[in-house]
Amino acid sequence: MSTSVSPVVRLVRGDITDQSVDVIVNAANSSLLGGGGVDGAIHRRGGPDILAACRELRASRYGKGLPTGQAVATTAGRLDARWIVHTVGPVFSGAQDRSALLASCYRESLRLAAELGARSIAFPAISTGIYGWPMDDGARIAVRTVLAETVEPVEEVRFVLFDAHAYVEFEEVLAMR
């Protein structure tokens, strides 16, 4: 059984594909075959090995796609990381509370990173782009889950945020912890 830890949490404004960490988390779509936003950037910068690994996963285990809230690891290709952990965030719905699925993305990514022996992990703000999740709520769920669910050997968690608005929202949540 893994031991819970209080990770060092860092906020970084920039491009997640520039991070030097053990695990980069990809906010993937269920096809695992690349898309827009973070997903597209990771596939473009990481090169064809990531897509090849994702195609193999689709053929062997995820024929219908990776379910929302789950996570799976592949090579990091040309990125300065050991692995990419792909997770599928929920599309925001004002009519249905899907926050448990969003928390599951962070929890399952952390669990998988720990199983892989990772000490550092970089997350984007999952579901806050095209999937429409409000940034303030997405930041609260992300930070709360990371603080509660990080286990050894993970020591450092980075939230890599593309714009100033996201950075400020995460900064405010971290200041209240």
UniProtKB/Swiss-Prot annotation:
SMART domains: A1pp. PROSITE patterns: MACRO. It comes from the Bacteria. Pfam families: Macro. SUPFAM superfamilies: Macro domain-like (SSF52949). Disulfide bonds: none annotated. InterPro entries: Macro_dom, Macro_dom-like. Gene3D superfamilies: Leucine Aminopeptidase, subunit E, domain 1 (3.40.220.10). Residues 1-177 form the Macro domain. Belongs to the MacroD-type family. This is Macro domain-containing protein in non 5'region.
